[in-house]
Amino acid sequence: MAAPCHRGVSAGDDAVGTGTSFKRKVRGKFPALPGTRPSVHNGQLLVSTGVPSLDHILGGGLAVGTLLLIEEDTYGTYSHLLLKYFLAEGVVSGHEVFVASANDDPTETLQDLPSPLTDEVPRQNDPKRTKDTSGPADDSQEMMKIAWRYQNLPKVETLPISSSRFGHYYDLSKTMPPEMSAKSHRFYLPRIMSANQKQNVSEVTCNYNQLLESIQRVVHQEGYDGSNPQKRPKTILRLGIESLGSVLWADDICSQERPENQHSLTRFLYGLRGLLRTSLSVCVITVPTYLIQNKAITTRLRSLSDTVVGLESFIGSEMEANPLYKDYHGLLHVHQIPRLNSLISDGSDTKDLAFKLKRKIFAIERLHLPPDLSDTVSRSSKQDLAGSAKLLSSGCGPAAGGEKHLDF
């Protein structure tokens, strides 16, 4: 039986007297983590790869908790450069960095990170600048007779780039100061093997297990999995693994068509993805897939990754001397885009992409053919043109059938 309705009592008085359980539904707020932003497609928290053009191709950036697999180019030059961009972005954004390698010492890799570019920020409320510019004001007015509109604008000074913005640009001609990347986690396989001599299982399985245990230790001790509260402000853990699966990791997938330990790398990726999904971390791995003899293994590696990008370098190939590709250094192939919190992936166009390495920056652009500005573009020789003009003039009647040719 419904409760009787009392007349004479307004709805506002009843709400004040008894209170109400109604609460306005608001959108959930994302954690204010430095160097991150929510995706406009699926609401996933994103971090930058260090290359803004690559972020745009991947749908805005790398989602936290995912794995990016970079298929190395022939000599590994550009793939290792992308890994350095990823690590440099983490250092500038204030993220924790974990570097693992079996070839180059991670300390040397961190010392070779590109330096971030500076922003030109106008400083309007600077007392020193106002004092210095108050004296020669008359001189500046005399000099600004033509460009008088610019004399009241604040001067522009180069300041260090802000760590709170998403995505930065880097100068490849300069390296980052060592103190910026001094605090990081490193895994150097030769040093680990020399300290751990006894191995009860196969060498490659032991190497991958030690790497996974090292990552688990950092994730758990630093509190990225939520088990232990982070002592400092909450941030993101960036994992960078170089040339995983190569012979330097004692793996034989790159040297034999039927390797004995073909499941060691796939088991490692299974464990790594499970660890990434339950922690505030993101990983980038480079794999020399061009050396893998069995292509079925390459297919498995792609299926075990969230995002797969391949680099095809022009070095040593026929396309290096092709004038159509003279402005580029290689092609970028996007093999896989993640499907996170949605049925389909981002619909951005990922075809016909090329990259070029300039003196200071690494850029990814849409592949387009340069305009052909030569004198003989799509034309025959002058003799052929004269012959065709003669045929045309002969069919135009007696008035046009003289000795002169049609001039186009």
Swiss-Prot record:
Entry keyword set: Cytoplasm, Nucleus, tRNA processing
GO biological process: regulation of transcription by RNA polymerase II; tRNA wobble uridine modification
Pathway linked to the protein: tRNA modification; 5-methoxycarbonylmethyl-2-thiouridine-tRNA biosynthesis
UniProt-listed Pfam families: PAXNEB
CDD domains on file: Elp4 (cd19494)
One GO CC term, this protein: transcription elongation factor complex
Sample GO molecular function, one term: phosphorylase kinase regulator activity
Compositionally biased intervals (Basic and acidic residues): 120-132
Subcellular location: Cytoplasm; Nucleus
Main localization, broad class: cytoplasm
InterPro entries found in the cross-reference section: Elongator_complex_protein_4, P-loop_NTPase
UniProt-annotated stretches for the region Disordered: 106-141
Assembly with partners or alone: Component of the elongator complex.
Protein purpose: Component of the elongator complex which is required for multiple tRNA modifications, including mcm5U (5-methoxycarbonylmethyl uridine), mcm5s2U (5-methoxycarbonylmethyl-2-thiouridine), and ncm5U (5-carbamoylmethyl uridine). The elongator complex catalyzes the formation of carboxymethyluridine in the wobble base at position 34 in tRNAs.
Family: Belongs to the ELP4 family.
Name of the protein: Elongator complex protein 4
Protein's organism: Xenopus laevis (African clawed frog)
Gene that encodes it: elp4
